[in-house]
Amino acid sequence: MKQVFLFLGLSLLMGTIALFTICGYDQIGTLHAAPIENVALNAKTPFAEGCSKCHATEPAYQEWQHAGHSHALVNLIEGPYEVQTSCLSCHSSGYEVFSDRVYPGHTYNIETAVNAVACSSCHSHTSKEEHLLVKPAKKLCVNCHKMDCGCAGAGIVHQSQSEMFLGREGAGVKRMPSPHVRAMKKRCVHCHMAKEDPETVAKHGGHTFIADFSTCSTSGCHDSVDNNMETKLPQYRAEIESKMQAVKKILDAAPDKTSQAYLDAKLNYDMVKGDSGYGLHNIPYANALLDYSLSLKSELE
């Protein structure tokens, strides 16, 4: 009987090791490099993820291929900012793991990175969270979608989805969280990952992360004719865009671009612009920020 249990135990262990090896994960469930002797398989780096070996035909992987996350590394390299290795923490899966590990002759940096924001940025085989997430859903996206990532440089707003959603960090405006902060316990995934059929490849939601505003009505939250988000959102966007143009005109004409009034007005403008362009994660806060910037016009002339 002991021999039977020993055999079963060894079989389970070998199966687990095989699973992690195939998927590109080590025994602690984090992304790991291919063996150094296999570097020839990838002339650029041994750090590539291998999730597509098993998941390439699944809807989640196919959706991700067309999502912004799959272009994160290319966007970084070809973007307008000076690229630093630390930028990889949000633009390339594996940086947080490999930056602390030494592989002879293979440093994880902007020249050797090949992964975009791929599977291991959000998932781990050893996680006890729902969907094997590395963190609870409400805490995951804000790791990168925030102002203080440092990629763009000190004082430059790179992106501001988190701060806009929570309604904070702007100049001259009291804290104003979006009503969705309380209503949506899982935060971002409610809008950006909602999809009707998990077994089909979607154009919105899922791993496309493209918000489908029709769900605002079908969820029962905005189901009245006067409160239809598919109709109202373009109106909100046009209003915010008009204010942004007015603020930009004032900023461009300001003679002193070092004054506190200028810095405050520009911060608010950059926050709204950094929130996917139009502050749609918190429309009342976006309007309040721009209104305050417009109120500084006389001080900026």
Predicted stretch roles:
Residues 1-9:
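N-terminal Sec-pathway targeting helices
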Residues 5, 20-301:
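Short sequence/structural segments immediately N-terminal
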Residues 8-19:
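Bacterial N-terminal signal peptides
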